[in-house]
Amino acid sequence: MYAPPFVRAFGIAVLAVLPSFSSPATAASLKSSGSSSSCRCFPGDACWPSPADWKAFNQSVGGRLIATVPLGSVCHGTTYDAARCADVKAAWPYADTHTDSSSSVLAPFFANQSCDPFLPRETPCVIGTYVQYAVNVSSVADIQKTLAFSQKKNLRLVVRNTGHDYFGKSTGAGGLGLWMHNLKTYDIHDYKSAAYTGKAVTMGAGIQAGESAATAFKQGLTIVSGICPTVGLAGGYTQGGGLGPLTTRYGLGADQVLEWHAVLANGSEITATPTKNSDLYWALTGGGGGTYAVVYSMTVKAHANEKTTGANLTFPNAGSEDVFFQGVQAFHDIIPAISDAGGTAVWTVLSKALSVGPVTGPNMTKATMDSIFQPVLQKLDALNITYSYSSGEFSSFYESNAAYDPPVVSNGLQIGGRLVKRSDFTGNPDGFIQAIRGIADQGGLVTGASYQLSSSLQHPPNSVNPELRKSLISFQIGVPWINTDWATDLHNQDLITNSFVPALAALLPSGGSAYLNQADFREPGWQQVFYGENYEKLLELKDVYDPNGVFWGRTTVGSERWAETEDKRLCRVS
Ligand SMILES: Cc1cc2nc3c(=O)[nH]c(=O)nc-3n(C[C@H](O)[C@H](O)[C@H](O)COP(=O)(O)OP(=O)(O)OC[C@H]3O[C@@H](n4cnc5c(N)ncnc54)[C@H](O)[C@@H]3O)c2cc1C
């Protein structure tokens, strides 16, 4: 499939005049752009593959090459279609719109207004920061051929699964994408190794959390995942750590991994387990997606369904703000008890309300859940705050989650993050309330995910940041994206980086750490903040498995050696 010429032409010609976003290195510190070999080849360069090259490559991958036609193309130029454009705009906030595309991403900032459906019709449709082409991967051979072609032609390679990444790691100007989304195999089987004996599932790299949960449930099984059904499991989620409703019960997503089946940058097909290629296993399991290899499938533990209680609580900020935040404090006070009882909670403080849910209690009765919440409800009654509380006991996590995990409308949240240990949180209750109140007052959303990782949870050594393991809460501080107001979006981005994240960091020793999947892409000192004590070893392994930097993404291990120039070309930093 090849794009209409206007899309390709504008994609190249107009790229340079698009609004730019900051990169970790200034243009001055980069080696010269143009077609310099220190930069990846870019559309318009002499080195860019000819139409005949693309045609031959397309044939070599069985016609699975997709030339990008941005979703917003129906809103511009000669392909404008009023009805379809209205449909695209209406669908834009829903994850499926982007996950089912070979190029679109959920974080609009990294689309850089390329062929933006919300821009006026007369604005040219440019491919811009979307990948130029993507291979709809169906086999290991597709991956190997794409890796070979991209390296032969010095192209920027982008591994993309669902496009959920908050850092824009699954898109890239002038990129050739490996689109993993349609690898949907799902094989439940018995597994035996030194580390684990029991049920397991081997899933293709395109399996999403909701698909996994539904299929496993029918077989009486539960698979660890996050709260969002559209996030992919084998990509950034598990490779980056993987928090979710079952974290306290079974450990992180990464802790479930028994085997990776992957392709290295040099094209070698490889299996990595705790005992075979164990250093690659270690790096892939927590060191961040899109860094060491292209994962074709992974094998993870499967747990038997068990009784699970779900709960939620909401109350508005309707009267005195002081009173509202006393209510929030009452909820904060029970967070350690939820973890101690084996549960997790997700909540968001907005300027107008507190919304708690899902609270998940695996192997917990409704009576236990209600007793944990009783002091909060009593306090809310005493404060005369009207609330809505609900809890329910189910025979499986799947059913509990279906009842208590609210639908996620996810497109376009800009975020920062901080991990908070129990002693820091319980030792300074007023400090956290004041910081959160200050953020909410300025229009920020403060989402918390609480959990507890006991040392009794067995897992092979992996590269998850130890700070993630030691924390009680992962805070995500967000500001909703406004599709029609880029200037305000940039202002909000500055608020996150310069005000919101520092407000939480100020409460933590040495400024604290953050979960590498849910944090600010402009985080200063991200190597330490995201990877902690593992960074040095992870960088050594990057040099072993990907010495030429074939895999690059903002804030991935070794990414500081490359940066984007003003025109978004990816170049080595001198
Ligand atoms: C709405 C929403 C809800 C979320 N909820 C949670 C949550 O509950 N818990 C949690 O821990 N995180 C959560 N996240 C964060 C999520 O885990 C990350 O965004 C993660 O990177 C998504 O992975 P993906 O593969 O689906 O996305 P993509 O954007 O496609 O990829 C993310 C990264 O993984 C790489 N990658 C993808 N596939 C492969 C592959 N096969 N091989 C090698 N590299 C690959 C990409 O190159 C990229 O670097 C959420 C994010 C969003 C937007």
UniProtKB/Swiss-Prot annotation:
Alphabetized UniProt keyword annotations: FAD, Flavoprotein, Glycoprotein, Oxidoreductase, Signal
Disruption phenotype: Leads to the accumulation of dihydrosorbicillinol as well as to higher amounts of oxosorbicillinol.
Superkingdom to which the source organism belongs: Eukaryota
E.C. designation(s): 1.-.-.-
Pfam families: BBE, FAD_binding_4
A molecular function GO annotation: oxidoreductase activity
Name assigned to this protein: FAD-linked oxidoreductase sor8
Species of origin: Hypocrea jecorina (strain QM6a)
